[in-house]
UniProtKB/Swiss-Prot annotation:
It comes from Escherichia coli (strain K12). Residues 37-56 bind DNA. GO terms for biological process: negative regulation of DNA-templated transcription. Important for biofilm formation. Represses expression of McbA by binding to its promoter region, which prevents colanic acid overproduction and mucoidy. The lineage of its organism: Bacteria, Pseudomonadati, Pseudomonadota, Gammaproteobacteria, Enterobacterales. This is HTH-type transcriptional regulator McbR. The keyword NADP does not apply.
Amino acid sequence: MPGTGKMKHVSLTLQVENDLKHQLSIGALKPGARLITKNLAEQLGMSITPVREALLRLVSVNALSVAPAQAFTVPEVGKRQLDEINRIRYELELMAVALAVENLTPQDLAELQELLEKLQQAQEKGDMEQIINVNRLFRLAIYHRSNMPILCEMIEQLWVRMGPGLHYLYEAINPAELREHIENYHLLLAALKAKDKEGCRHCLAEIMQQNIAILYQQYNR
């Protein structure tokens, strides 16, 4: 069928790009980490071309940097850059949660409840990677119900840009210390169920301020 090969190639590129974005956004890739095109292609079991194109796409949005010898690096996230990203995120995410309130269905709320239970379990197990991952899924599930795809795209891109800085939390934070922080997620879900727009904004603001404070502690060490 004409064009099938090209469509498959594009889908492979998008697959690699989305996978790398996810890894970047949860801090799975350490700042300064070197990604070699050939090695990555071998790990994924695909040709170099879609992998290289995916990496170049991430370079175009400053999520990766070009390095010599067909390699790319995960950029450092400086304190000043982190400040700027978090100030923008704060405004955009509070907007998204307020817009989502009226659009959440009973099924959406049930799915959020399941994610919150997974977040609680991850905290109790001390699984920092899972905490960060489920936090991301929980928040984005809410934001996407704003029905504003451009807004959500901007938020996700900012998470990709700041994500490498989260890597420092994996060994520096004891998940047991996050027990009180998880309570704010329960309060947020309760506000969502009550369709309390201002309550949702307040709860999310508390969550973001606490999470940002934890991250800044690592930068100030």
